[in-house]
Regions:
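N-terminal glycine-rich FAD/FM-binding segment characteristic of electron-transfer flavoproteins
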Residues: 1-205
Length: 205
């Protein structure tokens, strides 16, 4: 299990280990702060490469804050490996390839891809086990470690955090609520003519 964030994020890794993960890696450094999607993906890519070899990387589909669903695919692009998004389940694992089912909204697609690869999974793809109290009591914190900038292969701080981010968020705000609703009780051609008139008035047509 690997995540990126401040030291408080170590609690997330502990929870994952209580649920059955073998180990956890926290990629954390002051210079990682302020990272956009691109810089976050690059940082995680560096952290994964530091962690060792792999067959499949599993990522959540999207975060609950930025909600972009871009980090997983961008990690794969930085690593030069194939990736599948919105994965519902894994139907078969071969020696060098994996078969997955993806939710493409209007259809379900079955796809086979070479390993190593990266998959972003739907939240309902499985039912996570509950944290084990016994595992919590017996767990050694030796399975958790932190990786900082000086331990990555690319140690140029300009490639991380705010300096390495091609985009910056100016502000976050809820959409404006508008109350100028209009109920139209026409039907047929009268309704169609009225809608065309409104669209022309607003210069959509």
């Amino acid at each position: 299990m690997i995540t990126m964030g401040p030291m408080q994020a170590m609690e997330v890794l502990k929870e994952a280990v209580y649920m059955g993960a073998e180990s956890g890696v926290l990629v954390s450094d002051r210079c990682f702060a302020g990272a956009d999607v691109c810089a976050t993906s690059y940082t995680l890519c560096q952290g994964i490469q530091k962690a060792g070899t792999f067959d499949v990387i599993l990522c959540g589909k999207q975060t609950t804050d930025g909600d972009t669903a871009q980090v997983g695919p961008e990690i794969a692009e930085f690593m030069g490996i194939p990736h599948g998004a919105n994965v519902m389940d894994i139907t078969d694992i071969g020696e060098n390839e994996i078969t997955i089912r993806m939710n493409l909204e209007h259809r379900i697609q079955t796809q086979r891809m070479k390993m190593p690869c990266l998959l972003t999974v739907e939240k309902d793809a499985n039912t996570p086990r509950l944290p084990s109290y016994k595992r919590k009591l017996n767990m050694s914190l030796d399975c958790l470690k932190t990786v900082s900038l000086k331990e990555l292969s690319d140690q140029d701080s300009k490639h991380y955090g705010l300096d390495g981010s091609p985009t910056q968020v100016e502000r976050i705000f809820p959409p404006e609520k508008k109350k100028d609703k209009e109920i139209v009780e026409e039907n047929g051609q009268k309704l169609a003519r009225y809608l065309i008139h409104i669209l022309q008035e607003k210069k959509f047509l």
